[in-house]
UniProtKB/Swiss-Prot annotation:
Excises uracil residues from the DNA which can arise as a result of misincorporation of dUMP residues by DNA polymerase or due to deamination of cytosine. The gene is ung. This is Uracil-DNA glycosylase. GO terms for biological process: base-excision repair, AP site formation via deaminated base removal. The keyword Cytoplasm applies. It comes from Francisella tularensis subsp. novicida (strain U112). It catalyses: Hydrolyzes single-stranded DNA or mismatched double-stranded DNA and polynucleotides, releasing free uracil. The keyword DNA repair applies. Keywords: Cytoplasm, DNA damage, DNA repair, Hydrolase. PANTHER family: URACIL-DNA GLYCOSYLASE.
Length: 220
């Protein structure tokens, strides 16, 4: 099974057509939607299903200009690193001595190694967080999470915060490793995310399962 198989099947479903109709209508009415149309499915572009080793779930895309480009927590180069990603870098630096905090938040290197950076809602209206949370995207992304669980083995799922942790019911814990903590947001990072050791535990598990570990360092 490939992403193309899953997308082809879901695109035939009424809910998916409603999503596309909604986005087209909003754009026609002058609404600005992020990420750009060609970037909405970038998580699927950069991480092939065959190569997928890790899933990190986000909620919805960044809602300011020049930030979102289709990968959860990632921003385009030349943009300030968002606070949640700064805390992700802090945890990496705390737990992995050789990790060097980069000067950007562009996470494509992770995605190409098999880290699937999936927002559960794939679009957002400019400057309106969670504005597209009820248009049907979660039906699609829940299906994607379930398909990964059913068709893969030994995937590491990182579930940060209450929204992501609700997706635990979609994952077969007998086939995969589920790592849970609070969200890396400044509001909650100190209540469990900082110190969680997820990136170390992830690589230990991948090595145990005879898989290539993730190099969390990002080229500057």
């Amino acid at each position: 099974m490939t992403w193309s198989d899953i997308l082809a099947e879901e695109k035939q479903q009424p809910y998916f057509k409603q999503i596309l109709d909604f986005l087209a209508c909003e754009s026609a009415n002058g609404k600005v939607i992020f990420p750009a149309k060609e970037n909405i499915f970038n998580a699927f572009k950069y991480t092939e299903l065959d190569n997928l080793k890790v899933v990190i779930l986000g909620q919805d895309p960044y809602h300011n200009y020049n930030q979102a480009h289709g990968l959860a927590f990632s921003v385009q180069k030349g943009v300030d690193i968002p606070p949640s990603l700064q805390n992700i870098y802090k945890e990496l630096a705390r737990s992995i001595p050789e990790f060097k905090i980069p000067n950007h938040g562009y996470l494509v290197d992770w995605a190409k190694q098999g880290v699937f950076l999936l927002n559960t809602t794939l679009t957002v209206e400019a400057h309106k967080a969670n504005s597209h949370k009820d248009i049907g995207w979660e039906t699609f992304t829940d299906t994607v999470i379930s398909k990964i669980s059913e068709n893969k083995h030994n995937v590491v799922f990182m579930l940060w915060g209450s929204h992501a942790r609700k997706k635990k019911v979609l994952i077969d814990s007998s086939r995969h490793l589920i790592l849970e903590s609070t969200h890396p947001s400044p509001l909650s990072a100190h209540r469990g995310f900082l110190g969680c050791n997820h990136f170390v535990d992830c690589n230990k598990y991948l090595i145990e399962k005879k898989s290539q570990k993730i190099d969390w360092n990002l080229l500057c």
